[in-house]
A protein has these predicted regions:
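Active-site loop/oxyanion-hole signature of alpha/beta-hydrolase fold enzymes
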Residues: 51, 88-129
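Conserved serine/cysteine hydrolase catalytic core
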Residues: 207-285
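Short amphipathic, positively biased membrane-proximal segments
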Residues: 1-47, 51, 56, 92, ...
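A catalytic-pocket lid/entrance helix-loop region that shapes and gates access to the active site
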Residues: 154-194
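Conserved hydrolase catalytic core segment
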Residues: 123-166
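Conserved HGGG/HGGXW glycine-rich cap/lid loop of the alpha/beta-hydrolase fold
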Residues: 50-96
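Conserved catalytic-core motifs of eukaryotic protein kinase domains, centered on the activation segment
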Residues: 73-74, 97-103, 164-165
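Catalytic active-site module of serine/aspartate enzymes centered on a nucleophile-bearing elbow/loop
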Residues: 277-320
Length: 320
């Protein structure tokens, strides 16, 4: 009898939590409407936030890292706006973009990005900047669409081999399982209560930080991240088989504040700088993996690097 009452109490509590989560989700959708364009690709909605001057030259496309989406690029877009047109978008299943039935490997994400850019009327060429996990799909984009790609910027970007070489055994699997767990618990509001975006949003204005927190509280958010991690080996194979990038302008930014495995992570960033014949490499002093784009001071460094690649792309096009 006692165990039956406990089960009923737990079920009632979970039901109440789910009802509260649903009510808060409805509230958040009213409170935080999409700031950018909503386009449809292959039956699902994609969000693209365009900012900046409509000038000649490449458009900068900003790809967020694992656990984040377009508001994370607020300071970078603001710094670029006077002279460069940029678009920060949300991968399918994150932010204001709806879930895709397609697999979450780097090439598929790149194909969806190309479709969304086309539907939004954002013409090439593009300079693509990827932070963290976002480095994988922007590299896949450059491989699939070299004629559309004018340059790359990798901001403390993931290396395809990082989990194979990581000192902690099964680190990727642990991360994947944790995301699936949080995805299930998302129906009951736990990710909202824990504020899982507090690190990636630290330093952003209150509005953008709140948008990130609301987006991360959606039940499908963590499940989408888990799907990306599950197919990491597929993305790794795709990128390791990619064609050489030649003299494509490339800037690689690493950070000085690294977690466990910092020496390996910095070495991997140096390897990324060997992807092209005309790459620059810089360590952003004082920045961590998250603050390099969420902190305004460090975002200025990122924006400067992006402008440098945009100019290098323009100079390269004039020579060809």
């Amino acid at each position: 009898m006692r165990s039956g009452r406990v089960i009923l109490a737990v079920a009632a509590a979970m039901g109440s939590a789910a009802a509260v989560q649903q009510a808060l989700t409805v509230r958040d959708r009213r409170r935080y409407p999409a700031p950018g364009l909503l386009v449809r690709t292959d039956g699902h909605q994609m969000h693209m936030h365009v900012r900046g001057a409509d000038v000649s030259g490449p458009t900068v496309v900003l790809e967020a890292g694992m656990g984040s989406f377009s508001p994370n690029w607020h300071w970078v877009q603001q710094e670029l706006a006077p002279t460069v047109r940029s678009v920060a978008y949300d991968r399918a299943g994150l932010g204001w973009s709806r879930r895709s039935r397609r697999p979450r490997d780097a090439q598929t994400i790149a194909v969806e990005l190309r479709e969304a850019l086309r539907e939004a009327g954002i013409e090439p060429p593009y300079v693509l900047a990827g932070h963290s996990f976002g480095g994988l799909p922007v590299r896949a984009f450059a491989d699939l669409y070299p004629e559309l790609t004018a340059g790359l910027v990798l901001v403390d970007a993931s290396h395809p081999d990082q989990w194979v070489r990581w000192p902690t055994p099964y680190a990727a699997k642990i991360l994947e399982v944790s995301q699936w767990v949080f995805g299930w618990l998302g129906w009951f509001g736990l990710p909202r209560a824990l504020n899982l975006t507090r690190r990636v949003s630290a330093g952003l204005p209150a509005r953008q930080a709140a948008e990130l927190r609301a987006g991360a509280a959606l039940p499908g958010y963590a499940a989408t991240e888990a799907r990306q991690i599950r197919l990491w080996s597929v993305s790794r194979a795709q990128l390791n088989a990619a064609a050489p990038l030649g003299d494509l302008p490339l800037a690689v930014l690493a950070v000085s504040k690294q977690p466990v495995g910092g020496e390996l992570l910095t070495a991997l960033q140096h390897e990324l700088a060997e992807l092209t014949e005309s790459a620059s490499f810089e360590i952003v002093q004082g920045a961590s993996h998250e603050s390099v784009i969420s902190n305004r001071k460090y975002a200025q460094v990122v924006a400067t690097a992006i402008r440098g690649v945009v100019q290098a792309a323009i100079d390269r096009s004039l020579k060809s």
